[in-house]
Amino acid sequence: MTNNKFKSGFVAILGRPNVGKSTFMNHVMGQKIAIMSDKPQTTRNKIQGIYTTENEQIVFIDTPGIHKPHNALGDFMVQSAYSTLRECDVVLFMVAADEPRSTGENMIIERLKKAEVPVILVVNKIDKIHPDRLFEIVADYTSQMEFSEVVPISAKQGNNTERLIDTLSEKLDEGPQYFPEDQITDHPERFLVSEMIREKILLLTREEVPHSIAVTTDQMTRDEETGKIHIMATIIVERKSQKGIILGKGGDMIRKIGKMARRDIEIMLGDKVYLETWVKIKNDWRDRKMDLADFGYNRDDYM
């Protein structure tokens, strides 16, 4: 690209769990790169989505929802989210219009007051409220701190997201193109495969199971005869009872997880996939630093 006024920068998306951060980024990217579910703490790692046009490259960093951690994995997730404040050029503080400001938001606001970059308040899920309520919601948040801009959106419906992109572009300085124009994320395919499998477990299971699992993609090879991509993945659980839930009666659940995940993986890779999944028990892995690092949650990466 030869544009003397090409703009670029890194934009962190911060907020409590389930305010729509991943939904927004997937909408902007035009395809799924961050998994979504109705479970809190669905996003565990920082996910970078790369939005490129002729005039700009915006690298979005979708962070884990900020919450009060209850184990070492939770500590990792919160540390990962806050570490983006040291790396970004702009912060999007996303809140849900249909939920009142909570102690969680107040905690984030106190951190954001110390930020040395512009902070934009993004009021998401405006499709769920009456328009008359919007002024009241914005007034409540702006009474807590000064934001450089306020942009109401509906990430699910795409309302006002273009305006938010334009606002971000105005805040960014001229800069280089960090990634090739056809690259939409910095994560390797194996990570995305693991996340798509984990998403289906989040959708299909309940209670403690969704938060107690990790997924690793152990092997990805192409079968030269069939052209299919052979993927071997391991689902890690903390208890024998959880393994039984993941497997299901007669293997029904593990087959359902595999079928749903394979569909998304094939769309992402653009190839037919043979997916083989195994279930392994690792007692209390969420509180073991070595296990966390093995499964891709290394806290030292964000210190």
Swiss-Prot record:
Major location (coarse): cytoplasm
PROSITE patterns for the chain: G_ERA (PS51713), KH_TYPE_2 (PS50823)
Era-type G domain ranges (all copies): 7-174
Source superkingdom: Bacteria
Location of the region described as G1 in the Swiss-Prot/TrEMBL record: 15-22
Topology class, membrane: Peripheral membrane protein
Gene3D superfamilies linked to this entry: 3.30.300.20, P-loop containing nucleotide triphosphate hydrolases
GO cellular component terms listed in the entry, alphabetical order: cytosol; plasma membrane
Region (G4): 124-127
Residues holding GTP: 15-22, 62-66, 124-127
Entry keyword set: Cell membrane, Cytoplasm, GTP-binding, Membrane, Nucleotide-binding, Ribosome biogenesis, RNA-binding, rRNA-binding
Annotated segments matching region G2: 41-45
GO MF term list: GTP binding; GTPase activity; ribosomal small subunit binding; small ribosomal subunit rRNA binding
Region: G5, residue numbers: 153-155
GO biological process, one term: ribosomal small subunit assembly
Subcellular location(s) per record: Cytoplasm; Cell membrane
S-S bridge residues: none
Annotated KH type-2 domain residues: 205-283
RNA-binding keyword on record: yes
Entry keyword annotation includes DNA-binding: no
Chain positions covered by the region annotation G3: 62-65
SUPFAM superfamilies assigned to the protein according to its UniProt record, in alphabetical order: P-loop containing nucleoside triphosphate hydrolases, Prokaryotic type KH domain (KH-domain type II)
Stated family: Belongs to the TRAFAC class TrmE-Era-EngA-EngB-Septin-like GTPase superfamily. Era GTPase family.
Main function: An essential GTPase that binds both GDP and GTP, with rapid nucleotide exchange. Plays a role in 16S rRNA processing and 30S ribosomal subunit biogenesis and possibly also in cell cycle regulation and energy metabolism.
The protein's name: GTPase Era
Species for this entry: Lactococcus lactis subsp. lactis (strain IL1403) (Streptococcus lactis)
